[in-house]
Amino acid sequence: MMKAIQIHETGGPEVLRLDELPIPEPGPGQVLIRVEAVGVNFIETYFRKGTYKATLPLTLGSEGAGTVEKLGPGVTAFAEGDLVASVSIMGSYAEYALVPAEKLVKVPSRVTPEQAAAAMLQGMTAHYLAYSTFELKAGDTALVHAGAGGVGLLLTQVAVRLGAKVITTVSTEEKAALSREAGAAEVILYTEQDFEVEVKRITDGKGVDVVYDSVGKTTFEKSLNCLRPRGLLALFGASSGPVPPFDLIQLAGKGSLFVTRPTLWHYVATRQELEWRAGKILDWVATGELKLRMEHVYPLAEAAQAQIDLEARKTTGKILLEP
């Protein structure tokens, strides 16, 4: 038997249950993983609330790393004992997880399970945002909301690698220091300053080339106002709630702007893309070129508290669960 965090109904953190389940057997093309570290992400809260639909009961968890325990028929790319990591498959909030082999990547020997779980989803999100959704280049200016969060810290580092100037928004001086350490050229305390006014001041009224917005409802309108003509808003999350209905004609009046709502799954849909993005991120972690913050580690049984702290913005960097 194994322990797993499941939801049998949607709602608040109180619906998370620590259940005992049979250890599953891998079928054709599947791999059984003994989970050693689990990443906690906002996407799991969307499933918990019912924003994203799923069949219940559901074992939560979209990101994890661990050791290959058993191979299903037809799996040849991995061996028992391999350290592997995965994203995009629910089920990692558990002691064991079944994962399609095509969704797994091998973890370099210099990377720990904790580092892999901390880097995969948020690191690849940073990668696709900076390399594909809006291809950052030297001289570009980017506004990154939640600059001290898991994605924010990694996205800032990736953007700076590409030669971009990064402006971030954060809620406290402590988080501002972390954001600057990651490479942000300018940090705005949105609790004390109007970020739209500050961005206009910093850019001499020109606006930024791209806004990376994971906040949603409370930042969307002002984020649009921060863009230069023909700039792009990448709305890749909604931690403050979904954006209300919006008349697209407003984009013309604000400068022929572009808006996109990307998700990681469409940027790792092929094996080639998954290996490219995961390979880059894990290599950067292995060499120390990408710095991770993993100061918040909870036992698996405290998954509800981990989600409470995530949603309350009490944490910085990556939250992990330890089975």
Predicted region positions:
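Short amphipathic alpha-helix with an adjacent loop that forms part of the alpha/beta core around
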Residues: F195-G205
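Mid-domain Rossmann-like dinucleotide-binding core that forms the NAD(H)/NADP(H) cofactor-binding site
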Residues: A117-Q193
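Glycine-rich beta-strand-centered segment in the early N-terminal region that forms part
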Residues: P22-G39, K49-G91
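Glycine-rich phosphate-binding loop and adjacent beta-alpha segment
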Residues: V170-E173, T218-E289, P323
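Short glycine-centered segments of the SAM/dcSAM-binding site in methyltransferase folds
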Residues: L83, T141, K165, G231-L232, ...
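C-terminal hydrophobic helical "lid"/dimerization subdomain
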Residues: Q272-P323
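NAD(P)H dinucleotide-binding glycine-rich loop of Rossmann-like/cofactor-binding domains
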Residues: A37, Y46, L83-A148
